[in-house]
Amino acid sequence: MSRIGNKVIVIPAGVSVEVNGATVTVKGPKGELVRSFNENITLDIAENEITVKRPNDTKEMKMLHGTTRALLANMVEGVSTGFSKALEMIGVGYRAQLQGTKLVLSVGKSHQDEVEAPENIKFVVATPTSIVVEGISKEAVGQTAAYIRSRRSPEPYKGKGIRYVGEYVRRKEGKTGK
């Protein structure tokens, strides 16, 4: 059984956490995140530590306990250091470029795909074939990176497409001719 909910969250210097009923606001050097949690879960803030407590040991409360603690820890980490996901483009003519806050992808289609940056998300294009998605919300960074990847997922025969850096793409053998 997981014991994640019992771990204490350490608040780094420069980060403030405010609890207003079931709503938690976390402010830090990179920005501010607001999220609502279940009102049965209590948060105890003492000096530079947050402790998440549940009222009883029912299955639902145990699930919410660990989830709440993990989400809160991600909020604290996001406003202090931030999150990033790196993607790479493999394929002839596949390239990415920035136009303002928009990411324009050329991935072998008859048109270019444009991806608008959501709130608190920034795109970094160091080379035409590498994209880095940065932001303070782990959830938003992951969803945006997954959306960019879905514009042209890696195919199993030649491996062409957009993939996460370090992602293993299972390759298949092509047809054998007569």
Curated annotation (Swiss-Prot):
Record keywords: Ribonucleoprotein, Ribosomal protein, RNA-binding, rRNA-binding
What Pfam families does its record include?
Answer: Ribosomal_L6
Q: How would you summarize the oligomeric state and partners of this protein?
A: Part of the 50S ribosomal subunit.
The protein's matches in Gene3D superfamilies, at most eight in alphabetical order, are given as: Ribosomal protein L6, alpha-beta domain (3.90.930.12)
Which PANTHER family would you find in this protein's record? 60S/50S RIBOSOMAL PROTEIN L6/L9, LARGE RIBOSOMAL SUBUNIT PROTEIN UL6M
- State the organism named in the record: Lactococcus lactis subsp. lactis (strain IL1403)
- Which stretches are transmembrane? none
| Annotated Gene Ontology cellular component terms | cytosolic large ribosomal subunit
Q: What is this protein called?
A: Large ribosomal subunit protein uL6
Family membership: Belongs to the universal ribosomal protein uL6 family.
A Gene Ontology annotation in the biological process aspect, one of them, is: cytoplasmic translation
Q: Which domain of life is it from?
A: Bacteria
By its UniProt entry, which InterPro entries does this protein fall under?
Answer: Ribosomal_uL6-like, Ribosomal_uL6-like_a/b-dom_sf, Ribosomal_uL6_a/b-dom, Ribosomal_uL6_bac-type, Ribosomal_uL6_CS
Molecular function per GO: rRNA binding; structural constituent of ribosome
What's this protein's function? This protein binds to the 23S rRNA, and is important in its secondary structure. It is located near the subunit interface in the base of the L7/L12 stalk, and near the tRNA binding site of the peptidyltransferase center.
Q: Which gene encodes it?
A: rplF
